[in-house]
Amino acid sequence: MALSSGLLLLTACGGKSEDAGARGLLDGASQAFDAHDYTLATQLLDSLQKTFPAETAIQREALALRPKVIEQATLLKISTNDSLMALDQVTAEQTKKTLRWVKEPRMVEGFHISPAAYNPDFMNSTGIQARVSEIGEFYIVSSANPKLGHTSVALGAGTSEAATPAVPYDGESNYRVGSGEVITFSPQQSDTIGSFALQNRGKALTLTFRGKSRKAVKLTPAQVNGIADAYAYSSAITGARRLAAERRKLEAMLQVARNQMA
């Protein structure tokens, strides 16, 4: 009897038992990992770390599991990333064929444009050109001849409309050429126009010049498609570039996780 009492006393003094809640979170994280639910596994590990920091033995087990979760979650993200990047690359190749490359001697930089939209005398006319720069950025150039005092342009279809921000005359982005005026909108300022054209591909739209006076010009479905093609090409190029950068980040994360597992 005395021996049994002594064993009980030693067991009680040897350290407290683990918390059932902490063990439950770790078991849940392990089960989620086995089920390939890496988001849930991460959430449970985070909850365990925050709620039961004093459970050092269980935290050590969690520390061993976490890099495995990160590794598999990252591999899944890389696979998804690669699929999206391949899709963007195919889209870029296809839409590039619909565009023309223009680089004249007087130009500092060339651009891609729909062949139907290219007009060497563009700055002596009234309209817009959707262009894609050498690095894949979509931008709009508007020309009004004679002058309208315009500072922005809008595309409309019924009650739906998209417009650029106003770009006041500054002699640089908004400047004068002979009897006309030209505005080169930045990629950020042009995005709404490109997106609207892509959403309304195949439709006739109204182009409106806004400023001191207004002028509305009808765009044929072919003209709208030219804007949409340029925007789609730019979106694919910039999307693939962004995904390539994201892949490099994911590869670095994967290496860190594997180093922790080694």
What are these regions (language model features)?
Residues 9-12:
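C-terminal motif of bacterial Sec signal peptides marking the signal peptidase cleavage site
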Residues 49-61:
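Short solvent-exposed coil/turn linkers within tandem alpha-helical repeat scaffolds
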Residues 14-20:
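Bacterial lipoprotein signal-peptidase II cleavage site
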Residues 38-39:
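TPR-repeat structural position
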Residues 177-191, 202-262:
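Internal interaction segment
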Residues 26, 32-34:
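Hydrophobic/aromatic side-chain positions at a characteristic register within alpha-helices
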Residues 65-96, 105-108:
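Alpha-helical linker/edge segments of TPR/alpha-solenoid repeat scaffolds
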